[in-house]
Amino acid sequence: MNGLVFDIAHMLAGGLVLVSMMMLYQDRLYALLNVFALHSLVLTLSVAWQAFVQDAPHLYVTAAIALVFKAIIIPVALHRMIRQLGIHREIETVVGIGPTMLAGIGLVALAMVVMLRVTPEANPLAREDLAFALSVLLLGLLVMITRRNAVSQVVGFMPLENGLVLAATGAKGMPLVVEISVAFSILIAFIVIGVFLFRIRERFDTVDVRALDDFKGRRRK
């Protein structure tokens, strides 16, 4: 039974890393949003499984929060925002997909080596989850760094919190009040970012961050 528990937890956490890798090669905003929704769904399953393994009922609520807000509400709202803004659907990247994927593989390997070496005495399941969580965090940062479009950078930010939740639940859960506060903080940040994107669109007729850099350069002159 313990082997089965470990295998399922390992599969779900590894699936989260795999979906994070999928985000790296998406070249259209709608596809990126759909992959983020899948990312949050896999997180929901992982947290729910940890709730079962640890006999921690509050983690079921955490899983429900991830499902409702991250897998449904936020992706749907961003889909509507893209339509209303008339944003260009294709994503411009700083570097090509090939180098980005290679960098992603390198970051995953780095996360595994670092985390497994610094937690030799930890529970094997917790060690794996922490290593996978660090991989998700690093891949989310890579998505943000390699995208020019502000919306795609916002989507790259969202998996960072998913990685934090995976780490916390793998390390014997987290207080429900913390997860609720994090969820509401993300929603508030999402609303602010939405308003900000509308203002960018009104002012510059684009949400490409290069337009902001050009504007700042002109002001300095």
Identify what each model region corresponds to:
Residues 1-221:
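Alpha-helical transmembrane segments of multi-pass membrane proteins predominantly involved
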